[in-house]
UniProtKB/Swiss-Prot annotation:
This is Protein HEAT-INDUCED TAS1 TARGET 4. Induction: Target of TAS1 (trans-acting siRNA precursor 1)-derived small interfering RNAs in response to temperature variations. Up-regulated by cold (at 4 degrees Celsius), but rapid drop of expression after a temperature shift to room temperature (at 22 degrees Celsius). Highly up-regulated in seedlings exposed to heat shock. Expressed in seedlings, leaves, stems, inflorescences and siliques. Disulfide bonds: none annotated.
């Protein structure tokens, strides 16, 4: 029965219940925890491929991290009978969670959870392992995972999170594998970057600071005389690779007198981290 469940989930991977589509359409352009989870699983997938722990690039479930963040295992409350993959349990789950309209879905759950960081997600993966992406609900699913989801196989992930502050330190890590970072976003520069180089803040009254976004740095290369990082970013619900200048530094991000918006001299990419996996 468990094998049939996995086969069914693989066949419908990426498909959404209408409630999920509606929730996604209503969601803001940026969901910090979902983005952190997505960066974390991409870092793990890349590291496992480089270390030859996976024969090919294997996608793991970011939604698994969303579903399990903040949850503590309590053996005393485990209902072994409901945790089994049976026809009865599947029908019970559908009746209680899918066929019955819920007024307070994932959005209410999200409001009760702290915002996840990439480090949080990596540490959770080290603790619980990760299922393959196609074996779990899609990222942003509005339905809670069924009790019998504990039967879905997980790949064990062991290691530690390495954090560094400067790009010089980060570059040493990047030699071995992609790394996570946060990117200062300015609009409309990020909207208009296209195939060019994102250089952040430029002169002009139209510029405004969007905030920090979790990204994955894939590599560093030279482009038109500038050192640039090739960065994978989710912006306005779309994944893309952009070139980010490594030479740009700036002092402030606002001209309206709000001191809370002023920051110390910095590059566009900050707060670097990487999962250092154990192969034992």
């Amino acid at each position: 029965m468990a094998e049939r469940l996995l086969q069914s989930m693989s066949r419908v991977a990426g498909r959404c219940h209408p409630d999920c589509v509606k929730a996604s359409d209503e969601q803001e352009d940026y969901h910090a925890s979902q983005n952190a989870a997505l960066v974390a699983v991409n870092l793990i997938s890349s590291a496992r491929l480089i270390l030859k722990l996976d024969a090919e690039f294997t996608e793991y479930s970011a939604q698994f991290l969303m579903d399990n963040a903040g949850k503590e295992d309590d053996p005393g409350e485990v209902d072994q009978q409901r945790n089994q993959v049976t026809t009865e349990n599947c029908l019970r789950y559908l009746a209680e969670n899918v066929w019955t309209k819920k007024e307070n879905g994932q959005g209410g759950m999200d409001q009760q959870r702290p915002v996840l960081t990439v480090k949080d997600c990596l540490e959770l993966a080290f603790k619980k392992g990760l299922p393959r992406r196609e074996h779990w609900a899609h990222l942003g699913c509005t339905f809670k995972a069924p009790p019998f989801a504990c039967q879905i196989p997980r790949v064990p992930v062991k290691g530690e999170v390495v954090e560094v502050k400067t790009f010089d330190e980060a570059f040493k890590l990047l030699v071995h594998q992609p790394i996570g970072a946060k990117l200062h976003l300015f609009s409309p520069q990020i909207d208009n970057v296209g195939e060019g180089v994102y250089k952040g803040l430029t002169t002009g009254n139209e510029t405004h600071y969007v905030g920090l976004r979790d990204v994955l740095i894939a590599s560093v290369e030279e482009f038109e005389g500038d050192s640039v990082a090739i960065v994978k970013i989710c912006y306005k619900k779309k994944l893309s690779f952009i070139k980010v200048s490594l030479s740009v530094r700036f002092l402030s991000v606002a001209h309206d007198g709000d001191k809370s918006k002023f920051i110390a001299p910095t590059g566009l990419l900050v707060d670097f981290c990487v999962p250092r996996l154990s192969i034992n």
